[in-house]
C-alpha cells in the first residue's frame, strides 16, 4: 500500500512540476506587463486623485479634529 501511494505521489509531483513551470512562466510574463501598465498609468492616476482628496477632504478632517482653545 505504501509503495503504491509513494509512486502515485511521485507521478503527481512530476506532473505538477511540469504544469507549474509552464503556468508560472506565463504568469510572470503577465505580471511584467501589468507592472508596465501600473507604472505608466495607474500610479499617476492614483497619486493625482489621492493628492486632490488629501488636500480637500483629509485636510479639513484634521482641522475639524483639532481641539479649540
Swiss-Prot record:
Any GO BP annotation: neuropeptide signaling pathway
Domain of life assignment: Eukaryota
Keyword Transferase recorded: no
GO-annotated cellular components: extracellular region
Keyword Manganese: no
Compartments reported by the entry: Secreted
Keywords linked to the UniProt accession: Cleavage on pair of basic residues, Neuropeptide, Secreted
Prosegment location in residue numbers: 1-12, 29-32, 59-69
Family membership noted in the UniProt record: Belongs to the orcokinin family.
Function: Myotropic peptides.
Designated name of the protein: Orcokinin peptides
Record organism: Rhodnius prolixus
Amino acid at each position: 500500500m505504501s509503495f503504491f501511494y509513494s509512486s502515485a505521489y511521485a507521478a503527481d509531483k512530476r506532473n505538477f512540476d511540469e504544469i507549474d513551470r509552464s503556468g508560472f512562466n506565463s504568469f510572470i510574463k503577465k505580471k511584467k506587463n501589468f507592472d508596465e501598465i501600473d507604472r505608466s498609468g495607474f500610479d499617476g492616476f492614483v497619486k493625482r486623485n489621492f493628492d486632490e482628496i488629501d488636500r480637500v477632504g483629509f485636510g479639513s478632517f484634521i482641522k475639524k479634529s483639532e481641539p479649540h482653545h
